[in-house]
Design a protein with these regions (language model features):
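Sec-dependent signal peptide recognition
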Residues: 1-8
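Structured soluble/peripheral alpha/beta segments that form catalytic or ligand/cofactor-binding pockets
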Residues: 18-318
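C-terminal motif of bacterial Sec signal peptides marking the signal peptidase cleavage site
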Residues: 14-15
Length: 318
């Protein structure tokens, strides 16, 4: 039996407030009809452009790093089709002393570039380029008030997706690829127009879909971290009552040699939550908790507890 208990300072909790979504009948999520055809080998095109600018489609490439000085940096390149096309980059930078910088900047369509064969995303002089093994990420200080990044992310863990990485309910879907579950970060960071060398550990994933997230999920809880040589991802997504009200849990444990254990869906994996979060979210928000426990029927147990809120943002306020 492997038991992993993680007491951490960050836990990503995301929730969708109760919104009126109209009277449309939605197709239920069916656990037996989830895509599982791609096999275990993940190819570079899976981190390339996956959407076609159809209405309601969205896609983002996400990166976060915990630097050796204790700082946390987050970068995400978004594209959304909502009647018209929207393109933006978001950055967050938090230092141990409480100093914080965050900004979202929009770009014109003519200033963007994407490739389908691999991850090559460029917004003006900012880019997110890689091949599942090595990535170059650049944030131009001229676009972000003197804050910038020019770094390399080198994967130490192979990419992962549960089955095909797609959660679908009829024709509606949300997809996730952990392109770099863990990696080494090296490069330069600019803050207040002063450049320093940085190093640390980092993570990159890629998400896309064709319907608003709040029309698929009530809420979700997600974690990524390390214990010794192990890289761990744990999560639970909860579909809306209109989609059947299903819980979709998952667990991933790997080291440099490969996957040690992974499980996804409702096949012998169980979750419980503790420590209701109060005083942080709106009253009509779904109940969210700061502790997640995941237990599998083959005796893997993961316990995650968040002890500090670093950032609290409304996901759909852009």
């Amino acid at each position: 039996m492997i038991k992993l208990i993680l007491i951490i300072s960050t836990l990503l909790l995301s929730g969708c407030s109760n919104l009126y979504l109209g009277s449309k009948d939605y197709t239920d999520f069916d656990p037996q009809l989830q895509a599982n055809q791609l096999g275990n080998t993940i190819l570079p095109y899976e981190d390339g452009l996956r959407t076609n600018s159809k209405n309601k489609e969205y896609e983002w490439w996400y990166f976060d790093a915990k630097l050796d000085d204790g700082s946390i940096a987050v970068v995400y390149f978004w594209k959304i089709k909502a009647i018209k096309d929207f393109y933006y980059i978001g950055v967050n930078y938090n230092k141990p002393d409480g100093t914080e910088y965050k900004k979202i900047k929009f770009f014109k369509k003519n200033d963007t570039f994407f490739e389908k064969d691999s991850c090559n995303v460029q917004y003006n002089n900012n880019h997110f380029i890689g091949n599942l093994e090595k990535y170059k990420i650049k944030i131009n200080p001229d676009d972000f008030d003197g804050f910038g990044l020019d770094i390399e992310l080198n994967a130490t863990i192979k990419p992962y997706r549960p089955q095909d990485g797609i959660i679908n309910a009829g024709k509606d879907y949300f997809a996730w690829l952990a392109a770099v579950p863990n990696g080494l970060v090296n490069g330069k960071l600019t803050y207040n127009n002063e450049e320093i060398n940085i190093s640390g550990s980092g993570y990159h994933d890629h998400n896309w879909g064709n319907i608003e997230l709040q029309k698929l999920f009530d809420d979700w809880l997600w974690f990524r971290g390390t214990v010794g040589e192990y890289t761990i991802i744990g999560y639970e997504l909860n579909t809306t009552s209109a989609r059947g009200g299903y819980s979709i849990p998952g667990i991933f444990i790997a080291d440099s040699t490969g996957i040690i254990y992974e499980n996804y869906g409702q096949n012998g994996i169980f979750t419980s939550k503790e420590n209701l979060i109060t005083g942080l979210y709106k009253k009509n928000n779904e109940a969210l908790f700061s502790k997640l426990k995941i237990l599998t029927n083959d005796n893997f147990y993961l316990e995650i507890e968040g002890v500090e809120v670093i950032e609290n943002l409304y996901l759909f306020d852009v």
